[in-house]
């Protein structure tokens, strides 16, 4: 029990929504169904938010696909964090790189 006059620090949570328009795109906000700090244009492009999860950030060291410190900072400063999908793999570039290495090995 906290001592009188000492306030217990507020836990930090975020609410994560999946985009209905863009695959692998997520919007993190501070409170459930509160998009008041999210720019209108972003919301139009995001589509109807679909609740994915509510996540406590305190005591957590990392998130799967986002830098937790950037998420916390964005939530505090602007009230939201937008997680975009990772860039697509360039399979042709990877293949050509491997083929180039094999050619170099053959020429040695």
UniProtKB/Swiss-Prot annotation:
It holds the Pfam family YcgL. This is Protein YcgL. InterPro entries: YcgL-like_sf (IPR038068), YcgL_dom (IPR027354). Signal peptide: none annotated. PANTHER family: PROTEIN YCGL (PTHR38109:SF1). It comes from Escherichia coli O127:H6 (strain E2348/69 / EPEC). Residues 12-96 form the YcgL domain.
């Amino acid at each position: 029990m906290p001592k009188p006059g000492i306030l217990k620090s507020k836990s930090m949570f975020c609410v994560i929504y999946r985009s209905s328009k863009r695959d692998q795109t997520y919007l993190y906000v501070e409170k459930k169904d509160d998009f008041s700090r999210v720019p209108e244009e972003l919301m139009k492009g995001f589509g109807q938010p679909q609740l994915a999860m509510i996540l406590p950030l305190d005591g957590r060291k990392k998130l799967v696909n986002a830098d937790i410190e950037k998420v916390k900072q964005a939530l505090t400063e602007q009230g939201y964090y937008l997680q975009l999908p990772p860039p697509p793999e360039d399979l042709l570039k990877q293949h050509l790189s491997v083929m180039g290495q094999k050619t170099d090995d053959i020429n040695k």
